[in-house]
Amino acid sequence: MESTAIVPKGPVVGSEDMEKAEVIASGSTDIISTTSTATTTAAIGSVQEESVKQEDVPMEGGEGEVEEEEGETRCICGELDTPDDSGFFIQCEQCSSWQHGYCVSITQDNAPDKYWCEQCRPELHQLFTTDTGEARSIYKPVQEKRRQSRRKARSAAASKSHAANEAEKSPRNTSNTDDNVDDIGDEEDEVEDEASAVALAKDGNTRSSRRRRRNSMDDASTDQYSLDPGDSDKKLLDRKRATFMAREEKQYQRMLEKALKESRRTSHQEDPESYENDADIYQGDTDNHNGTTRLQTDVMLTEGKPDSVTNDDMKESLRPSKEQSMEKTNDVEKEASQEKESSTGSAQDTEKTDEPILPLTSISSSEDDSRKASSRGSKRVSKPARKGNRTRRSNTSSDTNQNRRSADIGTDKPVKPRLPPQRTSLNEMRRRVSAILEFISRTQWELSEDQSDREEFVRFVENQHFVEKVDTIYNGYNESLSMMDDLTRELLLWEKKYSNNTNAIQ
């Protein structure tokens, strides 16, 4: 508080007057300070009273809210207990009534902050009834939240898949040149592996050439990245064309081989002699390659021996091979004759067994002819093995057929009826009745046909005992027919009754 001095308006007379004026000013300041302190204390007291009043008011409101929260349970279903085991309730903001969360399609996980019942805010509810006649509701704000979350999840999944596809495409484009180079190298490796079977001594050279070519390819790929973008694109196109042409060439060679094999098979069916000659010519190269490799090994083993010894060894080594080839051809001829005698299968088997088998007229002293004969024998020996497999298959199929026949339901065994469930609709029952009526009509027709054959059974029979047995059988037929008639009558009455009722209801 600032003290204010009171200055007299009149003229100053003397020191006494000045002293009186100072005393008056000090007294006035004391009065002003006392009044200001009184006013401040009064203001503080009023503020405290107002704060106390404001604190008392929300307490009363809180008690009112507690009282309002204790509302009654008034659900759409009309029941007090929850229909599910969760026990989740939700309260209306306006009327404070409690409702089952299950009945309004709200769970504890997706419960909203504020909820209004169907009476206070009917536009937020979509009412419906279940199959059992129970009233239910769908709270629309919660449904909208679910839809939005589903849409977000779908969009996120779609964006992730799109990003993954783009990420896969980008490294493929960058590594395309390396893949093309590897494809060229792999195709060249296959061609060189086929050619390497000619001689064992050339394997090291082919491998070294392969490595050199691979290294040159890698150098070319590294140089490609160091060049300008235009040159790299051109080289990339050239690589693609080269790999495409190589693949086309490989595919063309495979197709040619398949066509040659098919033509040999057809020519074998028409002219077996020419087929054998072609097979000999076709296998000549591979046999010569194998023969050269074996002869090289024999020469390496017998380099230190004299010529006479080597000739004797060669003769002795060729004699058992000739004898083996003769024995194989004899065995093949015996098996072929046995196959012709025991051929009672299908037409394909007979055609294969009736094929002419040419005996070997002349056997040369070289290893190639013995190898050819052994290969022919192995090919011809495989035919009866196929027949044995077919006989096994036929035996297994006959066994399975016998098992199936034995597994059929017998007439003496009891059969359990298929009772309909309790919650079966009228349409389902009508369908069942029509199926039963159809079955009864078919069986009645079959039984009547069997009864008409009864006279043919007993026409030329004079033994009365046999006739009595036949009559007992057909008496059972009559009983079954009468039971079927009663059943059809009841089913027709049922169908007539309920079909009329359903038409009236519709």
Swiss-Prot record:
<feature type="modified residue" description="Phosphoserine">
    <location>
        <position position="175"/>
    </location>
</feature>
<feature type="region of interest" description="Disordered">
    <location>
        <begin position="138"/>
        <end position="425"/>
    </location>
</feature>
<feature type="compositionally biased region" description="Basic and acidic residues">
    <location>
        <begin position="312"/>
        <end position="342"/>
    </location>
</feature>
<keyword id="KW-0805">Transcription regulation</keyword>
<dbReference type="InterPro" id="IPR019787">
    <property type="entry name" value="Znf_PHD-finger"/>
</dbReference>
<feature type="compositionally biased region" description="Polar residues">
    <location>
        <begin position="394"/>
        <end position="404"/>
    </location>
</feature>
<dbReference type="InterPro" id="IPR053051">
    <property type="entry name" value="HDAC_complex_subunit"/>
</dbReference>
<dbReference type="GO" id="GO:0008270">
    <property type="term" value="F:zinc ion binding"/>
</dbReference>
<feature type="modified residue" description="Phosphothreonine">
    <location>
        <position position="177"/>
    </location>
</feature>
<dbReference type="GO" id="GO:0061188">
    <property type="term" value="P:negative regulation of rDNA heterochromatin formation"/>
</dbReference>
<keyword id="KW-0863">Zinc-finger</keyword>
<dbReference type="InterPro" id="IPR001965">
    <property type="entry name" value="Znf_PHD"/>
</dbReference>
<dbReference type="GO" id="GO:0045893">
    <property type="term" value="P:positive regulation of DNA-templated transcription"/>
</dbReference>
<comment type="subunit">
    <text>Component of the RPD3C(L) complex composed of at least ASH1, CTI6, DEP1, PHO23, RPD3, RXT2, RXT3, SAP30, SDS3, SIN3, UME1 and UME6. Interacts with CYC8.</text>
</comment>
<dbReference type="GO" id="GO:0006334">
    <property type="term" value="P:nucleosome assembly"/>
</dbReference>
<dbReference type="GO" id="GO:0061186">
    <property type="term" value="P:negative regulation of silent mating-type cassette heterochromatin formation"/>
</dbReference>
<feature type="compositionally biased region" description="Basic and acidic residues">
    <location>
        <begin position="231"/>
        <end position="271"/>
    </location>
</feature>
<keyword id="KW-0597">Phosphoprotein</keyword>
<feature type="compositionally biased region" description="Acidic residues">
    <location>
        <begin position="179"/>
        <end position="195"/>
    </location>
</feature>
<keyword id="KW-0539">Nucleus</keyword>
<dbReference type="InterPro" id="IPR019786">
    <property type="entry name" value="Zinc_finger_PHD-type_CS"/>
</dbReference>
<feature type="compositionally biased region" description="Basic and acidic residues">
    <location>
        <begin position="405"/>
        <end position="415"/>
    </location>
</feature>
<dbReference type="InterPro" id="IPR013083">
    <property type="entry name" value="Znf_RING/FYVE/PHD"/>
</dbReference>
<keyword id="KW-0156">Chromatin regulator</keyword>
<dbReference type="Pfam" id="PF20826">
    <property type="entry name" value="PHD_5"/>
</dbReference>
<keyword id="KW-0804">Transcription</keyword>
<dbReference type="GO" id="GO:0070210">
    <property type="term" value="C:Rpd3L-Expanded complex"/>
</dbReference>
<comment type="function">
    <text>Component of the RPD3C(L) histone deacetylase complex (HDAC). Responsible for the deacetylation of lysine residues on the N-terminal part of the core histones (H2A, H2B, H3 and H4). Histone deacetylation gives a tag for epigenetic repression and plays an important role in transcriptional regulation, cell cycle progression and developmental events. CTI6 links the SAGA coactivator to the CYC8-TUP1 corepressor. Involved in transcription regulation of heme-regulated genes and required for GCN5 recruitment, histone H3 acetylation and SPT15/TBP binding to promoters.</text>
</comment>
<feature type="modified residue" description="Phosphoserine">
    <location>
        <position position="216"/>
    </location>
</feature>
<keyword id="KW-0678">Repressor</keyword>
<feature type="region of interest" description="Disordered">
    <location>
        <begin position="49"/>
        <end position="71"/>
    </location>
</feature>
<dbReference type="GO" id="GO:0005634">
    <property type="term" value="C:nucleus"/>
</dbReference>
<dbReference type="GO" id="GO:0006357">
    <property type="term" value="P:regulation of transcription by RNA polymerase II"/>
</dbReference>
<keyword id="KW-0479">Metal-binding</keyword>
<feature type="compositionally biased region" description="Acidic residues">
    <location>
        <begin position="62"/>
        <end position="71"/>
    </location>
</feature>
<feature type="modified residue" description="Phosphothreonine">
    <location>
        <position position="174"/>
    </location>
</feature>
<feature type="zinc finger region" description="PHD-type">
    <location>
        <begin position="72"/>
        <end position="123"/>
    </location>
</feature>
<dbReference type="GO" id="GO:0033698">
    <property type="term" value="C:Rpd3L complex"/>
</dbReference>
<protein>
    <recommendedName>
        <fullName>Histone deacetylase complex subunit CTI6</fullName>
    </recommendedName>
</protein>
<keyword id="KW-0862">Zinc</keyword>
<dbReference type="GO" id="GO:0030174">
    <property type="term" value="P:regulation of DNA-templated DNA replication initiation"/>
</dbReference>
<dbReference type="GO" id="GO:0035064">
    <property type="term" value="F:methylated histone binding"/>
</dbReference>
